[in-house]
Design a protein with these regions (language model features):
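ABC ATP-binding cassette signature C-motif
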Residues: 1-178
Length: 178
């Protein structure tokens, strides 16, 4: 259900009913649950792979600019010249997050962003999202990630939306009190 909801709000699927509309100042970036389409059959290395997503950024034409973005996601040295088709699941997640950072979006939609990541990578993602000034819509089974990042919990269950301000622990406590 969550993946379907994200696909609908990102325009990849049509809703069965109802409508939604992003505001005119909203720019979105999407981290899909399945990112294989971005890597399968691709013969590019990391730097060149990232370059295909930067034509709108004039300063991104330099290798040092792209390496800096990849460095934020813990790619360094000769790792940036690895072919993307041989990357591990965690490395692909880190590439996708680097790609998202390039867009400068003010809304991020993340479907299970910590899947396949080691602790160091999860920490890097957490730190980046805590500093992010926009809106983050995400689904995750990683309770620590949810507790660290979420300040509003929305639960879609049986056709009903529950919306609560506060952390995940606050939300759980409210369920216990009922």
């Amino acid at each position: 259900a969550k993946t379907t909801l994200f696909k609908i709000v990102m325009g990849e699927m049509e809703p069965d009913e109802g409508t939604y509309k992003w505001g005119t100042t909203i720019t979105t970036s999407y981290f899909p649950l399945d990112n294989s389409a971005f890597f399968n059959g691709c013969d590019l290395n990391l730097v060149d792979w990232l370059a295909q997503y930067t034509p709108h950024i004039p300063e991104a034409n330099t290798e040092s600019f792209k390496r800096a973005f990849l460095g934020r996601m813990l790619f360094s040295g000769d790792d940036v010249f690895k072919p993307v088709k041989v990357l591990s699941g965690g490395e692909k997640v880190r590439c996708m997050l680097s790609r998202m950072m390039l867009y400068g979006s003010n809304v991020l939609v993340l479907d299970q962003p910590t899947n396949h990541l080691d602790l160091e990578s999860i920490t890097a993602v957490n730190n980046g999202l805590m500093d992010f000034k926009g809106v983050v819509l995400f689904a995750s089974h990683d309770h620590e990630f949810v507790q660290t990042i979420a300040n509003r919990i929305m639960v879609l269950e049986n056709g009903h939306l529950t919306d609560r301000l506060g952390t995940y622990e606050d939300y759980i406590a409210s369920l216990v009190q009922v």
